[in-house]
Regions:
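Protein kinase glycine-rich loop
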Residues: 18-25, 29
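Protein kinase catalytic-loop region centered on the HRD/HxD motif
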Residues: 132-145
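Conserved N-lobe loop of protein kinases adjacent to the ATP-binding glycine-rich P-loop
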Residues: 33-42
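Conserved short submotifs of the Hanks-type protein kinase catalytic core
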Residues: 90-104, 108
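Activation-segment/catalytic-loop signature of the eukaryotic protein kinase fold
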Residues: 86
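Activation segment signature within eukaryotic-like protein kinase domains
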Residues: 127-128
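AlphaC helix of the eukaryotic protein kinase fold
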Residues: 48-74
Length: 173
């Protein structure tokens, strides 16, 4: 199991770790301050490559990460988080994205169920439309980008009502 970054740790002289905000099979996600752009919060996705991989496969995995990061950094759509940087430290790769405030759809569904309420049809249709727009945009890229992990926990709803499709860990380009 990889060692978690410590709160206050600074990566690349630019990103100060605040706390861990997510964890999955591919790695961890941290909330960080961008020290170069005062007041900007970002999400750092950390991917640690399997140490047991032969050197040639480890190199291929890193090259694939860098290719995908380059493609994701070129994306510009209101329903996708903006990728602003990527870098490697040791066997760990990092993808820097805009931090998306708000709750994920799974959390909203659980909260509504606990209260015995339903999500509003108008809101759900708006969210579905925004997700569709993001997917159409991704699929129209050259080469097409396939998210491959659409689920409520990967759909963030910002306080302003904007939907962001997050977690490109299983993306296929």
């Amino acid at each position: 199991m990889p060692v978690a970054l410590k709160n206050g740790e600074i990566l690349r002289g630019r990103y100060r770790i605040n706390r861990i905000i997510g964890q999955g099979g591919m790695g961890s996600i941290y909330l960080a301050d961008d020290l170069r752009l005062e007041g900007r919060l970002c999400a750092l996705k950390e991917v640690e490559h399997d140490r047991s991989l032969p050197a040639d496969l480890a190199k291929q995995a890193r090259e694939q990460f860098l290719r995908e990061a380059t493609v994701l950094a070129r994306l510009d759509h209101p329903n996708l988080p903006k990728v602003s940087d990527f870098f490697s430290i040791g066997i760990r790769d990092y993808l820097v994205m805009d931090f998306v405030p708000g709750k994920d759809l799974r959390t909203l569904m659980v909260e509504a169920r606990r209260k015995g309420e339903y999500l509003s049809e108008r809101e759900v249709l708006s969210w579905a439309s925004q997700i569709s727009d993001a997917l159409i945009y991704l699929h129209s890229q050259t080469p097409p980008i396939l998210h491959r992990d659409i689920k409520p926990s990967n759909i963030k709803l910002t306080p302003s009502g904007l939907v962001k499709l997050v977690d490109f860990g299983l993306v296929k380009i």
